[in-house]
Amino acid sequence: MIGSITGNVEEIRDSYIILNVGNIGYIIYVSHKVLQTCKVGDNIKLYIETYVNRDNITQLYGFLNRQEQDYLKMLVTINGINYKTALSILSKLSPEQIFSAVVNNDKIAFKGNGIGEKLAGRIITELQYKINKMPIEETFSIIENDDSLAALISLGYEKLKAFNVIQEIKSKTPDASTQEVIRKALQKLSQ
């Protein structure tokens, strides 16, 4: 298994790059976001997910950060989502945008590239469960500095439910202190 690869970008293609590591060129499939940030000659580090397809061909999928890698792993566990489809979702949406789409039940965010309404609904349903099970340190910038959310999660509330309640409170009272947000959230969650 390969955890990460650091090397020089030798070629950039439509859906992959060739990364030269010790004079060996590795074909690594990446999202369009990664393709846009790379230039030939750049020295980059990619976190690698290895997949062996039906034809017994090993394919490498590369990510600039662990969040995208973790989301690919979650997405491919959903029935109807393969590595190519998961990578197309990550080309379109960042982990933060996926989280937001799941929280807001936004099926439209996932639709396209072979994903219809039924599969988009399944993605949301299954990711709600998986996101709630993620360790708190694996959450993202949209929630990582939120003390009120951390407090509710430490009290045993589900991450998505707590996030929704806090967002609602903050939209109604944007100047509320952390203590006020927690107090209002506890009242709302205990109803």
Swiss-Prot record:
Chain spans, region Domain III: 146-191
Keyword check for DNA-binding: yes
**UniProt xrefs under InterPro entries:** DNA_helicase_Holl-junc_RuvA_I, NA-bd_OB-fold, RuvA, RuvA_2-like, RuvA_C, RuvA_C_sf
Q: Name one GO biological process term.
A: DNA recombination
* Keywords tagged on the record: Cytoplasm, DNA damage, DNA recombination, DNA repair, DNA-binding
Q: For the region Domain II, give the residue spans.
A: 65-142
**Cellular localization per UniProt:** Cytoplasm
- Short name of any one Pfam family annotated for the protein: HHH_5
Output a single Gene Ontology CC term carried by this record.
Holliday junction helicase complex
Recorded GO MF terms:
ATP binding; four-way junction DNA binding; four-way junction helicase activity
User: Where is region (Flexible linker) located?
Assistant: 143-146
**Family from the record:** Belongs to the RuvA family.
Q: What is known of its domains?
A: Has three domains with a flexible linker between the domains II and III and assumes an 'L' shape. Domain III is highly mobile and contacts RuvB.
Record-given protein name: Holliday junction branch migration complex subunit RuvA
Q: Which gene encodes it?
A: ruvA
